[in-house]
Amino acid sequence: MCGIWALFGSDDCLSVQCLSAMKIAHRGPDAFRFENVNGYTNCCFGFHRLAVVDPLFGMQPIRVKKYPYLWLCYNGEIYNHKALQQRFEFEYQTNVDGEIILHLYDKGGIEQTICMLDGVFAFILLDTANKKVFLGRDTYGVRPLFKAMTEDGFLAVCSEAKGLVSLKHSTTPFLKVEPFLPGHYEVLDLKPNGKVASVEMVKYHHCRDEPLHALYDSVEKLFPGFELETVKSNLRILFDNAVRKRLMTDRRIVCLLSGGLDSSLVASSLLKQLKEAQVQYPLQTFAIGMEDSPDLLAARKVANYIGSEHHEVLFNSEEGIQALDEVIFSLETYDITTVRASVGMYLISKYIRKNTDSVVIFSGEGSDELTQGYIYFHKAPSPEKAEEESERLLKELYLFDVLRADRTTAAHGLELRVPFLDHRFSSYYLSLPPEMRVPKNGIEKHLLRETFEDSNLLPKEILWRPKEAFSDGITSVKNSWFKILQDYVEHQVDDAMMATAAQKFPFNTPKTKEGYFYRQIFEHHYPGRADWLTHYWMPKWINATDPSARTLTHYKSAAKA
C-alpha cells in the first residue's frame, strides 16, 4: 500500500501543486519522492512509500536501465510477478513486484500486461518513446485511483481524491475529480507540451471471466463439473491459494478478526499457511468492540481455537462519535452504512499502528458480496436475481466496502489484503450454478459454510454463526451502534434542518438526521463533491429505511430464537 500522484500538462507552479500530494502522505509513511519527467517541465510524479517488499530498491517512480523511456508509479501487489519472470525469463533489476509491469509492457503492450497481472493495483505508466500515458486499476478496485482531466489536456491522478481537490488550472477553477473505474485501463496520447488526450477507455476483465493469468498459475488442477463435493474441493484449493499468495511481504502479517465467518476463515487459513511457510513469529489477531459485543466473544473463541496471539480493543460510544469527523475525511464519502462500519475499523487500525510494528493486515472483505452473505438475500425472488445482485454489489465494491477497508487502514499507514476477492477464487465462485449459491435452510453463505465444514478450520458454532454486520457486531443487541449514533444526531440535527434538506442538498438528499449529519461533515471537507457517491447503500427486495441488518425482520426473528 502506497500513495501515487502525477500531473501532466500543469500550467501552475509545480512546487505549489506538489503540496496537494502531501495530503496522501499517510498512505506511505516510510519515504516520499517527487520527480520531474525528463523533457517535460510541467509533468511530474509523486510517491509516498510504505515499504512492504524490497526496502532498498522499492522507491518510485520505477525506472530500469533496460527501458529508460518507461516511468511507472503503482500502488499494489502483483502476486504472480515471480512466476511471470521465470516463465518469460525476464531479467530483473530489483526485487519489486511492480517491475513486472515494465517487462510485460515492453513484450506485449498494455492490454496483455494488465490481463496478466494477478493482484491488486492502481498504476500510472508513462512511455516517453511512444508518447503514451496509461492508467489501470484492478478488477474490484481494491486499490484506489482518482483522476481529474480538463478539456485542454491537463491530467492529474492520485490514490485519493483529497490529493486532487485543491489543484489549480487556468481554464478550470473547479476541477472535476472522479474515481477511475475498476477493471479498466485508459490509453492517452502525450503531447509535446506535456498535455494529454484520451484515446480509449477499455474494460479488460469481467468478474465472472477466468483471468488470463490463470494460464500461469501455480494452483493445482481443478476438478471438472458441478457436483457438490467437486465444487467444495475446488473452493478449498482456490481459497488456500488465495491466502498463500498474499503472504508476499518483508513485514509482519496480522489479521483482523471479528468472529464472523469470513474473517475467521481468513485467520484460520492464514495461520495454517504461515506455519507451512515456517514463519517464525506468532500470528496476531485483533478484534474491536464495546462491552458485551458479540463480536468480541466470538473472536475470542476463534483465537483460542486456532491459537493466535489475540488482542481486544475496547472503545466506548464517546470515542466512536468523536472519530466521525476523521473517519469521513479519510473515507471521502457520506454513505450511511459505510460511515457506521468504518468507525470500528478506523479505531482498530489506529491501535495496530500505535502498538505494533505490523503493517500488512488480512481481512474478510468481499465475501458478503461474492457469496450472497447479506441477510436480504433471503428475500431474492429467484437464484438468477440473487446472482445479478451479487455481481452488482461486486461492481460497486469500490464505492462502499472496498473503499472503507482501504481508507480506514491507509489512514494509519497500513496495507489490507483481502483473499475473498482473489481473481481465481471469485471467478470460479461466480461460475457456479446460481441455485448453488443462494441461502439455504434459512442460512446465508450456505455453500461457503458447507465447503469448510469438515476442514477443522473453525468451531462449528462459528462456522454456522448467523451473519452480523461489522457495524452491528461491535456493540450489543440491546444497544446497537446505529441506535447510539441516531440518538446522538437527534440532538445535532433538528426538524427545521430536515425540512430544508432538499434545498441544501439537492443531490442525494439525506432522508434521516443521521444522513444529514454525515453530509454536513462531508461538505465541510469536500464542498461540492457530493457526486463522488452515486447512491446510498441499501438492502434490496425489502422496504428498508435503514441499512442496519438489525432492523430486518429476519434478524429480529433469529435474535429472539
UniProtKB/Swiss-Prot annotation:
Gene Ontology molecular functions: asparagine synthase (glutamine-hydrolyzing) activity; ATP binding
Pathway where it operates: Amino-acid biosynthesis; L-asparagine biosynthesis; L-asparagine from L-aspartate (L-Gln route): step 1/1
Pfam families: Asn_synthase, GATase_7
Domain Asparagine synthetase: 213-536
Domain called Glutamine amidotransferase type-2: residue spans: 2-191
Biological processes per GO annotation: L-asparagine biosynthetic process
Result, substituting L414F: In ts11; temperature-sensitive. Blocked in the G1 phase of the cell cycle at the non-permissive temperature (39.5 degrees Celsius). Heat labile
Catalysed transformations (reactions): L-aspartate + L-glutamine + ATP + H2O = L-asparagine + L-glutamate + AMP + diphosphate + H(+)
UniProt-annotated binding residues for L-glutamine: R49, L50, A51, V52, V53, N75, G76, E77, D97
Residues annotated as binding ATP: L256, I288, S363, G364
Keyword NADP assigned: no
Sites of Phosphoserine modification: S557
Keywords, comma-separated and alphabetical: Acetylation, Amino-acid biosynthesis, Asparagine biosynthesis, ATP-binding, Glutamine amidotransferase, Ligase, Nucleotide-binding, Phosphoprotein
GO cellular component: cytosol
Entry-linked PANTHER family: ASPARAGINE SYNTHETASE, ASPARAGINE SYNTHETASE [GLUTAMINE-HYDROLYZING]
Additional notes on this entry: The temperature-sensitive mutation affecting G1 progression results from a single amino acid substitution.
The name this protein goes by in its record: Asparagine synthetase [glutamine-hydrolyzing]
